[in-house]
């Protein structure tokens, strides 16, 4: 780049020799002609061997074990909230709904919520969520609360 040209995007050029033209092989008998860099005879001179081919050795995709089982396409995914989290979010007790949990940032919206029984609760909660585990239901009712499942 000349000294009088300022460093701007329209003045940039690649360094000399940085960009070279693609070599066209197999055109005449000069350099890279005739056999075109493939040597003489043999499989690799005649056609391309697949990259996965290992020369007769048992290929990797056949050496590895098959995956067992299957993925259930109808599985229902729940966002989990434990009782200790509910006790922290509602220290005075009250009504617990999915919308309320979303507003408090405990769960994301537009997905199912399940309450699990990890932790203890001492205040009465009126829980209305998509699903509740058995242990959580026992602990909530023992504390004087009620449980309503939406699903």
From Swiss-Prot:
GO CC list: cytosolic large ribosomal subunit
UniProt-listed GO biological process terms: translation
InterPro entries, A to Z: Ribosomal_uL15, Ribosomal_uL15/eL18, Ribosomal_uL15/eL18_sf, Ribosomal_uL15_bac-type, Ribosomal_uL15_CS
One matching Pfam family: Ribosomal_L27A
Keyword set, alphabetical order: Ribonucleoprotein, Ribosomal protein, RNA-binding, rRNA-binding
Keyword rRNA-binding among record annotations: yes
Region feature Disordered, mapped onto this chain: 1-60
A GO molecular function held by the record: rRNA binding
Coiled-coil portions: none
Functional note: Binds to the 23S rRNA.
Subunit-level organization: Part of the 50S ribosomal subunit.
Protein family (similarity comment): Belongs to the universal ribosomal protein uL15 family.
Protein name: Large ribosomal subunit protein uL15
Organism: Streptomyces coelicolor (strain ATCC BAA-471 / A3(2) / M145)
């Amino acid at each position: 780049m000349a000294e009088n040209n300022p460093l701007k995007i329209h003045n940039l050029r690649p360094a000399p020799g940085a960009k070279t033209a693609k070599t066209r092989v197999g055109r005449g008998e000069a350099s890279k002609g005739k056999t075109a860099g493939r040597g003489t005879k043999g499989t690799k001179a005649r056609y391309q061997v697949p990259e996965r081919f290992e020369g007769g050795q048992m290929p990797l995709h056949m050496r590895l074990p098959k995956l067992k089982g299957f993925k259930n396409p109808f599985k229902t995914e729940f966002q989990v909230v434990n009782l200790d989290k509910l006790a922290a979010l509602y220290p005075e007790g009250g009504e617990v709904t999915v919308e309320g949990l979303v507003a408090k940032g405990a769960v994301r919206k537009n997905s199912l919520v399940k309450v699990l029984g990890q932790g203890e609760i001492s205040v009465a909660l009126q829980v209305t969520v998509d699903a509740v585990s058995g242990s959580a239901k026992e602990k909530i009712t023992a504390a004087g609360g009620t449980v309503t499942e939406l699903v």
